[in-house]
């Protein structure tokens, strides 16, 4: 096995020369300012996450930028609630003021899907602006010719009844009347035998 040795004269001179070179380098103030470590120059994922917009802020920017996706507050200067079509809501629903009172329940779900995805297919499937609460034209009426007024309410035929949708059956339980036969029956004990007095 071989051993390698350093020459002492070369190693001493190289160490001595390196120390002299480090002391000879001068850094100017401009270089110090340019090379100073700053947090803005460091790629820090936590700082990037803090400085980026929140999801609701991004959604608000999307609604303002994309006219296909109207928000409920698209008329911000008037502060009027609007439906997904941008139409002002004149009669709001009691439980959800961001939908019209006569909006179809399935349309509420479809409008949420449209607001989230922005897909115009959902907007095309909405029926409320066309029909309101009217029955669809292709709905089978099974021989009963029901006509509807401009508000989508069924019109009265004959005017005899004051109720709009006809008489609804109300459940009434049977009246239990005790007859004399039931009162005369004597109580029997175990195995059908008469009780002793």
Swiss-Prot record:
TM ranges: none
Glycyl lysine isopeptide (Lys-Gly) (interchain with G-Cter in ubiquitin) cross-link site: 26, 32
Biased composition (Polar residues): 158-177
InterPro entries: DUF2406 (IPR018809)
GO BP: regulation of cell wall (1->3)-beta-D-glucan biosynthetic process
Domain of life: Eukaryota
Positions of the UniProt region annotated as Disordered: 1-31, 157-197
Cellular component GO terms held in the UniProt record: cell periphery; cellular bud; cellular bud neck; cellular bud tip; mating projection tip
Pfam families tied to this protein: DUF2406 (PF10295)
Listed Basic and acidic residues bias regions: 14-31
Positions carrying Phosphoserine: 11, 23
Protein family membership: To yeast YGR273c.
Xref: PANTHER family: MEIOTICALLY UP-REGULATED GENE 9 PROTEIN (PTHR28186:SF1)
The protein's name in its UniProt record: Uncharacterized protein YMR295C
């Amino acid at each position: 096995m071989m051993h390698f040795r350093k020459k002492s004269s070369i190693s001493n001179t190289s160490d001595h020369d390196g120390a002299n070179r480090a002391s000879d380098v001068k850094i100017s103030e401009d270089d110090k300012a340019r090379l100073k470590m700053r947090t803005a120059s460091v790629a820090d994922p936590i700082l990037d996450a803090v400085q980026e917009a929140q999801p609701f802020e991004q959604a608000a920017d999307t609604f303002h930028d994309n006219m296909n996706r109207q928000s409920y507050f698209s008329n911000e200067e008037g502060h009027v609630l609007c439906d997904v079509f941008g139409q002002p809501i004149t009669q709001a629903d009691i439980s959800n003021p961001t939908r019209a009172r006569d909006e179809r329940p399935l349309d509420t779900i479809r409008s949420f899907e449209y607001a989230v995805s922005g897909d115009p297919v959902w907007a095309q499937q909405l029926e409320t602006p066309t029909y309101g609460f009217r029955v669809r034209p292709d709905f089978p009426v099974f021989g009963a010719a029901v006509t509807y007024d401009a508000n989508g309410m069924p019109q009265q035929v004959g005017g005899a009844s004051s109720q709009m949708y006809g008489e609804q059956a109300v459940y009434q339980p049977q009246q239990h009347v005790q007859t004399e036969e039931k009162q005369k029956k004597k109580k029997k004990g175990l195995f059908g035998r008469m009780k002793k007095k």
